[in-house]
Design a protein with these regions (language model features):
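Active-site SXXK
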Residues: 98-102, 120, 138-163, 193, ...
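Conserved active-site-proximal loop/helix segments of enzymes involved in bacterial cell-wall
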Residues: 163-194, 230-233, 265-333, 383, ...
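Extracytoplasmic/periplasmic proteins that interact with beta-lactams or build/remodel peptidoglycan
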Residues: 1-111, 295-298, 401, 406-437
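Active-site-proximal helix/loop microenvironment
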Residues: 135-144, 228-289, 297
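A short, well-structured edge-of-sheet supersecondary motif
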Residues: 102-130
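Short, Gly/Ser/Thr-enriched beta-strand-loop segments that form substrate-interacting elements
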Residues: 333-368
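Active-site-adjacent helix/loop patches that line small-molecule binding or acyl-intermediate pockets
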Residues: 90, 109-118, 163-174, 181-236, ...
């Protein structure tokens, strides 16, 4: 009597799928950070440097899918067994350093993001007041928008961007009369205008060189009119009705609102010319150790050429060397705060509403020639404040690139994991890839 053939089994079951809503709220608050770091050290020593949270999906468990197990017949359905373990890309040690910097700066309402701009992977995502200043909401972008205006200038007419702007009086004040180039006054080129955040120059360029269509298309290409990642608001740009509206839009005086995560994605564009969706979840595992498939991230896309990205970073170094952030990146004795590391950055500040206060930004990447770290800081300041956003960012860069009195670009690998042979934090997905690589048979020896 012939025995029936066993069910064909050639591969493990497909990964269960995670609902994106479960992953839209990383542990940004101090309370959730402390809980996540405790849980990260309780289950897997190899993942200790990364933050971990547990999720009980309850009735919202992933849909059943067809799978197999030796204990059940092939094709029988199974479900993810909760609670689920969410393993973040957020680095415990770096996040603790960021919290210390914010505490020393007495930050009441503010956010800090540290990102690997080459991949979009978040290394720290901190929010001092999730109720008063939610990290997923859009706020006035202030002069950060000048980076996009400068990119548009370099695209439209590289020679024009090398020419000078002429302005009179206070470079930060713009009115209808100051939208046109005066017959005489002080001069500034694009690099100097970026470094000093010259509103008159950027307003003139917006009106006479770029126009509304080019500015709005640039905002759209940079991803500023869409959500930067799941769970975050889309950016928005107000309608332009007058020349003054256009000038204020291009200089950042009004009209554009974005989340800090939009600005974090900008660091990726500055690094390689490509928009990359920021992400903060490495993997999700059920109670049986089965990985769940994560929602697919948006495809990266080219926004500007790598040549323009390189040129922008070179210009933005002037901000930290002799521009609006010069004092933040120097010690009281005038020495570089992060010696040997050039930092490209941009400041921004603007009074706004909803909520009311002074919005102060800093965005930067380092090392400027080959960025591995991006930092974004946003504060909402009241009548009293203790530290500028550029000062907070400078200390975050110092914590990333310095150890004791030694500062070196390679020290960032403590958090990004780039340094060969470095036995530090690795993502579980990195370990899986390493296991797969080590399991491959060695190549055959060449024939004599």
């Amino acid at each position: 009597m012939t025995r029936p053939a066993p069910p064909a089994v050639s591969a493990p079951p497909p990964l269960l799928e995670v609902e994106s809503a479960w992953l839209e709220d990383p542990p940004r608050s101090k309370a959730r950070f402390e809980k996540a770091r405790t849980e990260s050290s309780s289950f897997d020593p190899s993942a200790k440097p990364r933050l971990v949270e547990w999720l009980d999906p309850g009735g919202a468990a992933p849909a059943a899918v067809a799978g197999w197990d030796e204990a059940i017949e092939a094709g029988a359905p199974f479900r993810a067994s909760g609670p689920l373990r969410i393993e973040y890309t957020l680095d415990e040690a770096l996040t603790e350093k960021v919290w210390r910097i914010m505490r020393k700066g007495r930050v009441d309402r503010g956010q800090v993001i540290v990102i690997d701009p080459r991949t979009g992977r978040l290394l720290a995502y901190v929010s001092a007041d999730e109720e008063g200043l939610p990290a997923n909401r859009a706020y006035p972008s202030a002069s950060i928008v000048k980076v996009l205006t400068a990119a548009a200038m370099l695209e439209v007419d590289p020679d024009q961007s090398d020419s000078t702007c002429v302005y009179r009086g206070n470079k930060y004040r713009v009115n209808r009369r100051r939208l046109d180039r005066p017959s005489s006054g002080r001069e500034s080129d694009l690099e100097a205008a970026l470094a000093t955040s010259n509103n008159q120059c950027f307003s003139q360029w917006a009106v006479h060189v770029l126009g509304e269509e080019k500015l709005r298309s640039t905002l759209r290409r940079f991803g500023w009119l869409n959500p930067p990642a799941p769970g975050h608001e889309a950016g928005r740009a107000e309608a332009v009705e007058t020349r003054l509206d256009l000038g204020r839009l291009g200089s950042g005086l009004d009209g554009v609102r974005v989340t800090p995560l939009h600005v974090a994605a900008l660091t990726s564009v500055l690094t390689g010319g490509r928009w990359i969706e920021p992400w903060w979840v490495d993997r999700v595992v059920d109670s049986h150790g089965r990985s769940l498939a994560l929602p697919e991230r948006a495809d990266s896309r080219e926004v500007i050429s790598s040549e323009i990205a390189d040129r922008l970073r070179t210009m933005l170094v002037s901000t930290t060397k002799r521009g609006t952030a010069k004092s933040a990146f120097r010690t009281r004795r005038g020495r570089p705060l992060v010696p040997g590391i050039e930092i490209a950055g941009k400041t921004g500040n603007l009074s706004g509403r909803d909520p009311s206060g002074r919005y102060e930004w800093f965005m930067g990447v380092a090392p400027a020639k080959n960025p591995t770290i991006g930092v974004v800081v946003l504060q909402l300041q009241g009548h009293l404040w203790w530290a500028k956003s550029s000062e907070l960012a400078a200390n975050v860069f110092k914590a990333t690139f310095c150890e004791g009195k030694r500062c070196d670009a390679e020290l960032a690998s403590r958090f990004t994991g780039d340094l060969p042979g470095f036995e530090g934090p690795m993502l579980i997905s990195d370990l899986d890839a390493l296991d797969a690589l080590e399991s491959e048979p060695p190549p055959a020896a060449p024939a004599p």
